[in-house]
Amino acid sequence: MSDTTQSPNSYMPVLISACLLLMLSFGLRSGFGLFLQPMSEANGWGRDVLALALAIQNLSWGISAVIAGGFVNRFGTTKVLLGGIVLYGLGTLGMASSTTGLSANLTAGVIIGAGIAGTSFGIVLPAIARAVPAEKQGWALGIGTAAGSAGQFLIVPAAQVFIDWLGWLGALQLMGLLGFGMAVFVIPLARYGNEAGAAPAGTAEISLWQLTRRALAVRSYVLLLVGFYVCGYHLAFITVHMPGYVVDLGFTPQVGAWSIGTIGLCNIFGAYYSGVASGKRPKHTMLSAIYVARAIAILAFLLLPPSLFSILGFSAAMGFLWLSTIPPTSGLVAQFFGVRHMPYLYGLVFLSHQLGSFSGVWLGGYLYETTGNYDGIWLSGAALGLLAALLHWPIKEQSYEASLSAASASH
């Protein structure tokens, strides 16, 4: 982090631009689940077809996040963001014209996934972390994460309105154009991204292979990486399948949209609180508590009779916990290894998250088509929440940055 980044006048424009970009990126992505039912019906598909494409999207997002993190070190944040924006917009427009499972897998899956990777938390949060003073990193990461949730709250209900007015096809085309609009917010971020690849004076360069091998030798990092799989499992399943699940319970599609929107609204507060708290409290115990609370919320939702109150109550509870994992998780990566390698090493952790996302989305669609309900995926989500809590508990919060330049690392 540069010494010139200490004044609020220097970092606030960066933070505001980053937040607006994340609002669009995360908000648009969160709206794709609304198209599961109408697009499937229009093309004569079962829900498993588009669910597979959206599962591939999450997998592509995760794999591309690692690649994008490496590209940031080499080419800088600006070029990665612009490349991601182009892919995001083209993929969304391509999804609108997809009439086969294969084309949906390519557009809604591979291309949009790569676009999200280039415009989402793994690229933008490290730029925020570099822009603000160290003592404000937790707060700033919480603000950035909350902005993504604000996008979910605002854009998902708006997307449902667009579907009602324009039909699913017109709404999806409009979302593609909005994706291109993210380019407006890239310029202020350039100042804190383009020198990411430069090694500090007197420090030897390290290859991505060496960086990966040495980071994976740190036990606490591996526990964090494995535990984040569960976060992706929860978030992606609910984002994609909750609207259809609500309709199956006998409610209107608008209730499904407001369920996702309520998650986004409550997560604005949850993510902000998490960011503030992660600067004051042990991050690993916060993560354990979050995953236990998710498991309890899921089980309570299954046990309560279906009603508007139970749907919105679950959405509010899960929303408060939704992206509250990101400030402590990204903060731990920065604490372990510093901010220079954060885009790549957070990208590896996020790849685990997206493997969980792929599992949750695909398995949800598969179980629905084979059993006719979502009970199995809900129960597995509760069980995995408890497992994640156990995985995070033994994490040791300390710096392992020296291990990246050591001949060997074993912690």
Predicted regions and their residues:
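Conserved MFS/SLC helix-loop-helix module at the cytosolic interface between two early adjacent transmembrane helices
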Residues: I63-L102
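Hydrophobic core of transmembrane alpha-helices in multi-pass small-molecule transporters
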Residues: M23, G91, S103-T119, Y229, ...
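Helix-loop-helix hairpin linking two adjacent transmembrane segments in secondary transporters
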Residues: G144-N194
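C-terminal transmembrane helical hairpin of 12-TM major facilitator-type secondary transporters
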Residues: V255, I263-N267, K280-L332
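Extracytoplasmic gate region of multi-pass secondary transporters
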Residues: F32-L36, V218-Y272
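Intracellular juxtamembrane helix-capping segments at the cytosolic ends
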Residues: M39, G118-V132, S324-F337
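Helix-to-loop junctions at the C-terminal end of transmembrane segments
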Residues: S64-T77, A271-P282, E369
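Cytoplasmic helix-loop-helix junction between adjacent transmembrane helices
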Residues: A108-A146
